Design a protein with these regions (language model features):
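Active-site loop immediately N-terminal to the catalytic Tyr-X3-Lys motif
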Residues: 12-18, 40-41, 87, 105
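Short, flexible catalytic-loop segment of classical short-chain dehydrogenase/reductase
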Residues: 28, 50-60, 64, 68
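Active-site helix of classical SDR
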Residues: 23, 31
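C-terminal helical subdomain
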Residues: 47, 55, 71-106, 110, ...
């Protein structure tokens, strides 16, 4: 089984992040092509699209955006988190658990799929 990671940017696009979104759309296209080409050999291919992930990269985004907008880091965090139905960021374990599932026999007929692990993004570009 092949499991690739893309991003919710590959599903929705994001203003002011065209190169990043384009790269993530490309990952999804690659995965779908692999699913078609490798399927006859019994090899599945799927993509995981995480939303905003807790960690050092996102901390940098929050700090830079807070400074640019004259807000606190927590105000920016809350703005992003409120853009999901579940109201929180993704943790690394959320992504890992999906990857384990997709690589397991429990997902033996799951191929060519794009799975968002994002708490259901309802607003990909919250105005914070």
């Amino acid at each position: 089984s092949v499991v690739v990671t893309s991003s919710t940017a590959g599903l929705y696009g994001y203003p002011n992040r065209a190169p990043y979104a384009a790269a993530k759309w490309a990952v999804i296209g690659l995965m779908k092509t692999l699913a078609m080409e490798l399927g006859p050999f019994g090899i599945r291919a799927n993509a995981i699209c995480p939303g905003s992930v807790e960690g050092p990269r996102m901390e940098g985004v929050l700090e830079r955006e807070a400074a640019a907008k004259g807000m606190t880091r927590d105000q920016v965090y809350d703005g992003y988190a409120s853009g999901t139905a579940l109201g929180r960021f993704v943790e690394a374990d959320d992504i890992a658990n999906m990857a384990v599932f997709l690589g397991s026999d429990a997902a033996r007929l799951v191929s060519g799929q794009v799975i968002a692990v994002d708490g259901f993004t309802i607003n990909p570009d919250p105005k914070v």
